[in-house]
Amino acid sequence: MAVSLRDTVKISEFINLSKQDEILPAFMTKVKSVRISTVDKIMAVKNDSLSDVDLLKGVKLVKNGYVCLAGLVVSGEWNLPDNCRGGVSVCIVDKRMKRSNEATLGAYHAPACKKNFSFKLIPNYSITSEDAEKNPWQVLVNIKGVAMEEGYCPLSLEFVSICVVHKNNVKKGLRERILRVTDDSPIELTEKVVEEFVDEVPMAVKLERFRKTKKGKKRKKEKKKRVVGNSVNNKKINNSGKKGLKVEEIEDNVSDDESIASSSTF
């Protein structure tokens, strides 16, 4: 039987629990459980896509508690023949954050000639159980230079996370372990550029543009509806006795105060 991505993940690579947390029953310690999520999968069909990803799939949460996203392992498989050109940038996003540079948890770049790849992130921050149920994470995928017909899937991505479920938001004993990564290691560091594939545009900038495009389309639809409504309501009958309609031009003072902070590279 083949080894799955979930089976290759070791909790000790991401966190150290105190002896107290390891020995004592769950009701006597702040840490309720340490879990490895089941694998969530995304098929990257479009060159640019922003998709929801369930990083806590299969994890039982505590009511009115917290969950710490201690670590994340992402595995990618190119569904292409050997020696194809192009590559991909993969970015993990916290969609709760409005500023794009703060929403990006980490990015990774891989060429298409590398048949498969894996990388890990250590977000190491907690959110409430209520927020976790809203599935707050996304993945931004930017495939560049891969010549494939539309409708086919050049890349498959799998995600598995290590998380700590706790009743109180206290991080004592949840220390992050920094690992040394060598050339022979199967898992590589965040933002490491492999071979000669270099992404010219930072992923935070890509996320900002992607969000602006979505908001721009939404505003355009709303503006069109408003213009159609005004053209009907602004027509009034001329009281001078002459035939015809008098059209009053009413200035639209609705302004969009929404501002998006400019993103910067990190």
From Swiss-Prot:
Disordered, as annotated region: 212-266
Function: Transports viral genome to neighboring plant cells directly through plasmosdesmata, without any budding. The movement protein allows efficient cell to cell propagation, by bypassing the host cell wall barrier. Forms a ribonucleoprotein complex with viral RNA. Binds microtubules and modulates microtubule stability. Can bind double-stranded DNA.
Organism from which the protein derives: Tobacco mild green mosaic virus
Principal location: host cell
Family membership noted in the UniProt record: Belongs to the tobamovirus movement protein family.
Cellular component terms (Gene Ontology): host cell cytoplasm; host cell plasmodesma; host cytoskeleton
Protein name (record): Movement protein
Top-level lineage group: Viruses
Keywords: Host cell junction, Host cytoplasm, Host cytoskeleton, RNA-binding, Transport, Viral movement protein
Acidic residues: bias regions: 249-259
GO molecular function list: RNA binding
Basic residues composition-biased segments: 212-227
InterPro entries per the UniProt record, alphabetical: TMV_movement, Viral_movement
GO BP term, pick one: transport of virus in host, cell to cell
Location(s) in or outside the cell: Host cytoplasm, Host cytoskeleton; Host cell junction, Host plasmodesma
Biased amino acid composition, Low complexity: 228-242
